[in-house]
Each structure stands twice: as structure tokens, then as C-alpha cells.
Amino acid sequence: AISGLAIGGGFEVACQSDRMVAHMNSTVGLVETGVGLVPGGGGCKELLWRWVQDAKFHDNHDNAAIEVFNIIGYGKIATSPILALPLKLIMEEDVVVENRDQLLFKSFELINSLKSSYQIPKRPSFLLSGLSVKEQMHEILKDLESQHIIFGYDVDIGLHLADVLSGGANSEPTSLSEQDLYDLERQSLIKLIQSHKTRDRIHAMLSTGRRIKN
């Protein structure tokens, strides 16, 4: 159940539940790139899985990866569950509650309704082309940099995100498991957190509440 602000790691916890119950005024999103990181708690995996299950992307996981690259790369947020639907931050089967006081009740109600028919979800798997989709992501970054939409360290962060969403070091089409995506997320997160530029961004956010461009 979410209410108010559910972004970054908080959203990663919520979105990997079987269902979410969200208050109408909830704000959701994966905003890690703004502080020099990539989602490292399953956010990349979960959002990619949601997109590849869309009928339009069943046969082309690369296109789903591009969609997710843009959503996470821009740090897109949705200020209501309705606005979150097209980004797949909230799903059609999730429950939206208008009255905040009903949030916990509706959550228990949903749990009880799932008891009799619950089935373990299918394990995510992804088929990504490797170098081909990674090069597409790199071209997006080059284009944004040439238009002065992103600068300096933004590109480095984008390259790490591209590495996660293209399947890492694989240059050929590769089938990836849920655990593979978790591992790639963690590797990129650890590399980025060691950079003083990431730490500068985190410090600025904590001390001023604002992002810096470095």
C-alpha cells in the first residue's frame, strides 16, 4: 500500500508486490538518476518485465528496454495513479483508493480476495540483443547531449543504465533471468556510488533538496 511519496527505493519495494493499493494522491517513480545512481533494488528489472509483457513488445524486448531506458533515464514521475498507468508504474490490476483512511482496509481486502486463487507469478525472463540495443541507447544519449538536454555526468549515468537494460557485456542476443538483471543493477550501482560526482549529487540533494548538474 502506498500513499504520498513513493519514489526510488520505496517504489522498488512496492512495485515488486503481486498487487499495489495506492491512494489517489500518490506520487511514484524511479528517480535515482537524479542523484547519480541507477535503481539497484529491482526497479530496472520490474519495470522492464512490465513492459515486455505488453502485447506490443512480446516479440521485441529491445523496444521495451528502450521505453524503460527513457522512463528511468529521465527520472519520470507520476503525480497520481492515473498518470502512472501509461508508464506502467501502476498497473490496471492495482487498486486505487480515494479515501486515505480506507487504504489499510482495502489492502487487507485485496489480500483476502487473492487467497483462494493465488498462483505464484511466472519468473521474468528477457531476450535482449546486447550490443545492438545498447548502441541505440548510446545514440539517444549522444542526441540529448548534443541538444544540451543532458550534460557531463548525466551521460556516464546513462551509460550505466544502458549496460543494465541491454544485458551487460553480452554482445549477442542473450536470454536473461530475473537474477541476471538484479546482478547487473547491483554492479552498476556499486560502480556509481564509488564516484565522487555521485556523492556530490547525493550531498546536494540531502543538504539543499535540489539536484545539481556536474
Located regions from the model:
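Glycine-rich beta-to-alpha active-site loop
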Residues: 1-35
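Intrinsically disordered, low-complexity segments enriched in small/flexible residues
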Residues: 49-80, 86, 92, 97-214
